[in-house]
A protein has these predicted regions:
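Ligand-binding pockets and gating/stacking loops
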Residues: 1-423
Length: 423
């Protein structure tokens, strides 16, 4: 039975509230120096990139097609750069880079509701209060010299859907993701026009002095979390050039796509280059209860080229070998096609994709039955997947967090890494 988090952590403040509040006291303009990659090191730090296809992408129209069957639908399966492996014809660009990917076709998450499935997919278990993968990685891979936030999530404008159902859990405010809406910088990063530079500096000094006196009297997690998050807000402000996509070449903008998902992925690449440990990009509207084949075609058309471009870009820049990539939804879709041409929610047998750091490229793990209703070989759970993602980043997934004298397992002790997927 998992241990409960320290009671002190129940006071963890909202990271977004801190950022907005702190930003009003910070003063700086956009800096003139160009975007720079993280400092070169003998051994590049591991990073995480997650694509969350929110709503439930259909495994039958993406990674595990069943053409010519009663459940397969109208689309063909096409050959890929991996001999003998076929994926849906809706992913022609991805088919050309399959030799870089590892496809898992045997995930059984057992959950088929948006809210619980989104949380469990990201946390690797159904028990509430645990950190999502990105927050866990930000904690477990952090370095003393880190000044930027460890985990950033990029949503589309207009809605975050169910993707807000992750978070840092008992790790507290310091590891909450910075949530961006579109490819714009966080709101209120600039000093307010009514606050002078002198006033801003004074506010900063008072804040630091007050915080230090408070911490000397009473050591509490929220105080340290506030101070750290304030400093990270300031560091983000000083790196506003990260968000300036006008620095990207016309060719790159075209390759990634001028749609919002393409531009968000360009920003994700820039965040990784700047040294952010974990970046998650969300892609919406995969929930196809009606007209499934139309909507999956529309969503795949936008995702396919951008995703394939991003992976090739990481490889060409030498970043893929130290960046672990996960492509997932919160669940799959039913093999049965209903009378409205839709597919419902399905957690029993569906697919995810991995690439990059720690993963054996060019492989398919597991299989489903001919009708896609059940896992046939090598079933894995969400807990196993969480262990595997951590292990691919060189993290001991059997370890525990030590917080305020209590321990919490990093990953579900009842699960384990899938060694066959690990390089």
């Amino acid at each position: 039975m998992p241990h409960r988090a320290s009671p002190d952590l129940r006071f963890a403040v909202s990271r977004r509230q801190i950022l907005v509040g702190a930003a009003a006291a910070l003063g700086s303009g956009a800096l003139a120096y160009p975007l720079r990659a993280a400092p070169l090191e003998t051994k590049p730090r591991k990073q995480l990139l997650v694509f969350l296809l929110s709503g439930g992408a259909s495994q039958l129209e993406t990674w595990d097609p069943k053409p010519g069957t009663a459940t397969g639908g109208p689309f063909r399966a096409i050959p890929t750069s991996l001999p003998g492996v076929h994926i849906s014809e809706l992913l022609p660009h991805t088919a050309k880079i399959m030799h870089r990917l590892a496809v898992v076709r045997s995930l059984d998450s057992k959950l088929a509701g948006h809210e619980p499935a989104t949380y469990a997919m990201q946390a690797g278990r159904i028990v509430p209060g645990y950190p999502e993968l990105g927050s866990a990685v930000a904690k477990l891979l952090e370095r003393p010299e880190d000044v930027l936030p460890g985990h950033v999530v990029i949503h589309r404008t207009g809605t975050k859907g169910y993707t807000d159902l992750g978070g840092a859990g008992f790790l507290g405010a310091k590891y909450e993701p910075i949530r961006l809406i579109g490819n714009e910088p966080p709101k209120n990063l600039l000093r307010l026009p009514t606050v002078s530079e002198t006033q801003s500096a004074l506010i900063d000094r008072v804040r630091r002095s007050t915080d230090e006196r408070y911490r000397q009297r009473r050591e509490l997690g929220p105080s340290a979390a506030y101070a750290t998050t304030y400093d990270q807000a300031k560091a983000l402000m000083e790196r506003r050039e990260i968000f300036d996509l006008t620095k990207e070449s016309t060719a790159d903008v075209e390759r990634y796509g001028k749609h919002e998902f393409g531009q968000n992925c360009l920003l994700a690449r820039r965040l990784l280059m700047a040294g952010i440990t974990s970046v998650k990009v969300t892609h919406f509207d995969w929930d196809s209860h009606q007209h499934n084949f139309h909507w999956q075609k529309v969503r795949c058309a936008e995702f396919d080229r951008t995703f394939a471009t991003f992976i090739e870009d990481l490889a060409e820049r030498g970043m893929l070998e130290h960046t672990h990539v996960l492509v997932t939804s919160e669940m799959g879709r039913t093999p049965q096609i209903d009378n409205l041409g839709g597919r419902g929610h399905w957690g029993k047998a569906w697919s995810v994709v991995m690439a990059g750091s720690g993963v054996k490229p060019g492989m398919v793990y597991g299989s489903t039955t001919d009708d896609g209703m059940e896992v046939k070989d090598d079933k894995i759970s969400l807990g196993d997947l969480f262990h595997t993602n951590l292990s691919a980043l060189g993290i001991d997934s059997s370890a525990s967090y030590a917080i305020a004298g209590q321990t919490n397992p990093v990953a579900d002790p009842a699960a384990k890494p899938v060694d066959a997927l690990l390089a």
